[in-house]
């Protein structure tokens, strides 16, 4: 982009914060409401792509300690393990376990394995979408 895109860069900083916050909300709300890992991953991806459009791609990649190719592999492994591990304990494929854990400041928190599965989906979607966009753009904004 040009050096004088002050408005775009300023608005991007605000919009990226909003997108990442909304992505977290959609991810965690997806357990009981519409949303989850896939939609949250798309929202996270759009935040990264917006940063690539507003700023220099190489500067953004240097400032983010994220390798998106490794991110998609880690996400796929997390999802696969979450789906397969219950089989070794005599449960069905993709069996969901849940527990209530007490935290001193938060109180009682409802934790499920589906959240871990959705995290794997989110990481995979972010890794795939951003890798495809970087490949299509040639790593240039």
Swiss-Prot record:
Pfam families membership: MnhB
Record carries keyword Ion transport: yes
Query: Which keywords has UniProt assigned to this entry?
Result: Antiport, Cell membrane, Ion transport, Membrane, Transmembrane, Transmembrane helix, Transport
What's the domain of life for this entry? Bacteria
- Coarsely, its chief localization is membrane
Task: Please give one Gene Ontology molecular function term for this protein.
Answer: antiporter activity
Q: Which PANTHER family has this protein been placed in? A: NA(+)/H(+) ANTIPORTER SUBUNIT B (PTHR33932), NA(+)_H(+) ANTIPORTER SUBUNIT B (PTHR33932:SF4)
Spell out the NCBIfam families in the cross-references. Answer: PRK12573.1, PRK12574.1
State the name under which the record lists this protein.
Putative antiporter subunit mnhB2
Q: Which organism is it from?
A: Staphylococcus haemolyticus (strain JCSC1435)
User: Gene encoding this polypeptide?
Assistant: mnhB2
């Amino acid at each position: 982009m040009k050096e004088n895109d002050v408005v775009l860069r300023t608005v991007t900083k605000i919009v990226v914060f909003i997108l990442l916050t909304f992505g977290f909300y959609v991810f965690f709300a997806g357990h009981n409401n519409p949303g989850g890992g896939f939609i949250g991953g798309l929202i996270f991806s759009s935040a990264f792509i917006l940063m690539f459009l507003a700023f220099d791609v190489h500067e953004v990649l240097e400032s983010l300690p994220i390798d998106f190719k490794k991110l998609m592999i880690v996400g796929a492994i997390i999802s696969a393990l979450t789906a397969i591990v219950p089989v070794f304990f005599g449960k069905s494929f993709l069996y969901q376990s849940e527990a209530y854990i007490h935290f001193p400041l938060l109180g009682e928190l409802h934790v499920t394995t589906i959240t871990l599965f959705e995290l794997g989906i989110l990481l995979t979607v972010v890794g795939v979408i951003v890798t495809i966009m970087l490949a299509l753009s040639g790593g240039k904004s």
